C-alpha cells in the first residue's frame, strides 16, 4: 500500500528522514539552540545557555525514545549502516559524530563563560552525550512503559547533574 504513494523503499526512507530533520529543527528552535551546524551559524552557538541545551537534550531523548517514527527510523538506520558506506555516513551524522560535534561546539562556547577550569570541550561532549546513547539503547531493550519512564527520568537527572557539576 505504501508504494502507491512512494516510488520505492529509498523514497520512503528519504521522506522519513526529511520528517525527522524537520522535527529536529522545530525542537531546536523551541529550546533555543541553533538549528544548524556550527559551520553554518557560529554566532548562534555563543548565545546558548546550559538550560537551553539541557532542555533540548531532554526533548531529544523523549523524541528518539517515544516517537514511533523516530524509533523505527533510528533502528532502521542502525541496521542499514552496515550495508553501505552512504548509510554508515548518515548514521554517524544523525546519531553519533554529528550530535557529538554539535554538542562539543556548544560546550566550547559555554566553557568560555566559565571561571573554573573545565575538561576539554571534546571530553565534556563525550561525557555529556554518551549517557544519551546508552540510555536510549536501554530504553529500546524493554517494552515496559514504567521501565522506559524510569530510564527517561535517569537521563533527565543526569542532564541536570552534568550542568550542576560543570556550569553552575
Which residue stretches match the model-derived regions?
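A short secondary-structure junction motif
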Residues: 23-27, 31, 67, 84, ...
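C-terminal alpha-helix
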Residues: 106, 157-168
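Amphipathic alpha-helical packing segments from all-alpha helical-bundle domains
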Residues: 51, 65-78, 82-112
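Amphipathic alpha-helical linker/stalk segments
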Residues: 16-56
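Amphipathic alpha-helical segments that line or abut small-molecule/effector binding pockets
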Residues: 43-66, 71-79, 122, 126, ...
Amino acid at each position: 500500500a505504501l508504494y502507491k504513494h512512494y516510488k520505492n523503499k529509498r523514497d520512503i526512507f528519504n521522506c522519513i528522514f526529511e520528517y525527522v530533520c524537520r522535527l529536529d529543527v522545530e525542537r531546536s528552535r523551541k529550546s533555543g539552540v541553533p538549528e544548524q551546524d556550527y559551520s553554518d551559524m557560529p554566532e548562534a552557538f555563543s548565545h546558548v545557555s546550559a538550560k537551553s541545551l539541557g532542555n533540548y537534550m531532554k526533548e531529544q531523548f523523549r523524541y528518539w525514545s517515544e516517537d514511533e517514527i523516530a524509533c523505527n527510523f533510528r533502528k532502521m538506520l542502525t541496521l542499514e549502516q552496515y550495508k553501505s558506506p552512504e548509510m554508515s555516513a548518515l548514521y554517524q551524522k544523525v546519531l553519533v559524530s554529528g550530535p557529538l560535534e554539535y554538542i562539543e561546539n556548544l560546550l566550547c562556547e559555554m566553557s568560555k563563560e566559565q571561571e573554573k577550569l573545565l575538561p576539554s570541550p571534546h571530553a565534556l561532549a563525550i561525557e555529556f552525550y554518551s549517557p544519551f546513547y546508552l540510555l536510549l539503547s536501554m530504553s529500546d531493550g524493554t517494552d515496559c512503559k514504567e521501565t522506559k519512564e524510569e530510564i527517561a527520568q535517569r537521563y533527565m537527572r543526569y542532564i541536570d547533574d552534568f550542568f550542576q557539576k560543570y556550569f553552575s
